[in-house]
């Protein structure tokens, strides 16, 4: 009996190497089958017995969990979609460069406008009235002391004629150079006479500061002839031919 028990114990004992039994051919073949089943790809749906299939569920959520299958990256400037983050980053960098160039151009334009405004500040009063600015000199070029004062000279060239022989034709105003330049001015008296031409002639009185006030009393034939002879002109109307 003891020999039989010993033989049964020796036959039932197994030798294991790294957790695998190497004594029985049947056990070794079963273990190899299990390892082959565990190495099969989970995408084909072949999972070993007792496995929960977690790896297959991750692939489904990545591949078609939401129905699209691909993640989109949208640009915050133009709302354009890209397939990866690298393409989106390069696209947004281009947007940033364009915005920097635009800001630089705006700053340069603002500086130029400020410089032009400061340079034209002295002439701003002439910009309100362009007609005045065309004829009036700038105030900073000529001071009040440097502006020449108007001289009381004759307004037109006349031959030497005595003050009593002044003749005014066609309402012209003539200032005598012999009179005082600081006179109070001129006073005019217009009157109409009976003729076919309506208003005929005018009377002018030259006011002087000192001395008598000579006046022109109408149009006399003698004074008019003397004045016209001095200029070499004949301004009298006549129906007779010239020279008579």
Swiss-Prot record:
Annotated Gly residues bias: 53-68
Designated gene of the protein: GIS3
Predominant cellular place of this UniProt entry's protein: nucleus
Function description: Probable transcription factor required for the initiation of inflorescence trichomes in response to gibberellin and cytokinin. Acts upstream of GIS, GIS2, ZFP8, and the trichome initiation factors GL1 and GL3. Binds the promoter region of GIS and GIS2, which may be direct targets of GIS3.
InterPro entries cross-referenced by the UniProt entry: GIS3/ZFP5/ZFP6, Znf_C2H2_sf, Znf_C2H2_type
Biased amino acid composition, Polar residues: 30-41
Protein name: Zinc finger protein GIS3
GO terms, molecular function: DNA-binding transcription factor activity; transcription cis-regulatory region binding; zinc ion binding
GO cellular component, one term: nucleus
Lineage: Eukaryota, Viridiplantae, Streptophyta, Embryophyta, Tracheophyta
Subcellular location: Nucleus
Note: Plants over-expressing GIS3 have increased trichome densities in sepals, cauline leaves, lateral branches, main inflorescence stems, and have ectopic trichomes on carpels.
Free-text disruption phenotype from the record: Decreased number of trichomes in cauline leaves, lateral branches, sepals and main stems.
Region spans: Disordered: 26-69
């Amino acid at each position: 009996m003891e020999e039989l028990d010993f033989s049964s114990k020796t036959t039932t004992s197994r030798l294991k190497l790294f957790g695998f039994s190497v004594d029985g051919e049947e056990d070794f073949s079963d273990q190899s089958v299990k390892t082959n089943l565990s190495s099969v790809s989970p995408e084909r749906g072949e999972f070993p017995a007792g496995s929960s299939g977690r790896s297959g569920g991750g692939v489904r959520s990545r591949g078609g969990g939401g129905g699209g299958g691909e993640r989109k990256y949208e640009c915050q400037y133009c709302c354009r979609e890209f397939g990866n983050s690298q393409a989106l980053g390069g696209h947004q960098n281009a947007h940033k460069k364009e915005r920097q160039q635009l800001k630089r151009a705006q700053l340069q334009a603002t500086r130029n406008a400020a410089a032009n405004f400061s340079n034209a500040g002295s002439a701003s009063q002439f910009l309100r009235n362009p007609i005045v600015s065309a004829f009036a000199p700038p105030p900073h070029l000529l001071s009040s002391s440097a502006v020449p004062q108007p001289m009381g000279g004759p307004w037109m060239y006349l031959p030497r004629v005595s003050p009593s022989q002044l003749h005014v034709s066609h309402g012209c105003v003539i200032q005598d150079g012999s009179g005082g330049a600081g006179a109070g001015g001129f006073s005019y008296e217009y009157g109409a006479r009976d003729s076919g031409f309506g208003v005929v002639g005018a009377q002018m009185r030259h006011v002087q500061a000192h001395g008598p006030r000579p006046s022109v009393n109408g149009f006399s034939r003698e004074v008019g002839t003397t004045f016209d002879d001095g200029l070499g002109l004949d301004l009298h109307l006549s129906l007779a031919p010239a020279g008579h």
